[in-house]
UniProtKB/Swiss-Prot annotation:
Source organism of the structure: Diacronema lutheri (Unicellular marine alga)
Listed name of the protein: Cytochrome c6
UniProt-annotated location(s): Plastid, Chloroplast thylakoid lumen
Subunit structure: Monomer.
Pfam entry (one): Cytochrome_CBB3
Residues annotated as binding heme c: C14, C17, H18, M59
Gene: petJ
SUPFAM superfamilies (alphabetical): Cytochrome c
Its job: Functions as an electron carrier between membrane-bound cytochrome b6-f and photosystem I in oxygenic photosynthesis.
Length: 83
């Protein structure tokens, strides 16, 4: 996906609750721990796409709010930050 666009979409829709940096805004909302989570999927962006589309626990589903390509771009961006 388009990482630059994914960063823009992330900033506009996800950054209020999530951080992709090691410094955490809130313990539960940081994606820093996603590095180990994402490693379980061997770089498969589909797991991120699924969670963003369908939501989980307190996180709302963005499937009706964002276009499929925007969600794919967010997944690419998050995965790029997870290293």
């Amino acid at each position: 996906g388009d990482i630059a666009n994914g960063e823009q979409v992330f900033t506009g829709n996800c950054a209020a609750c999530h951080s992709v940096z090691z410094z955490k805004t809130l313990e539960l909302s940081s994606l820093w721990k996603a590095k180990s989570y994402l490693a379980n999927f061997n770089g498969d962006e589909s797991a991120i796409v699924y969670q963003v589309t369908n939501g989980k626990n307190a996180m709302p589903a963005f499937g009706g709010r964002l276009e499929d390509d925007e969600i794919a771009n967010v997944a690419s961006y998050v995965l790029s930050k997870a290293g």
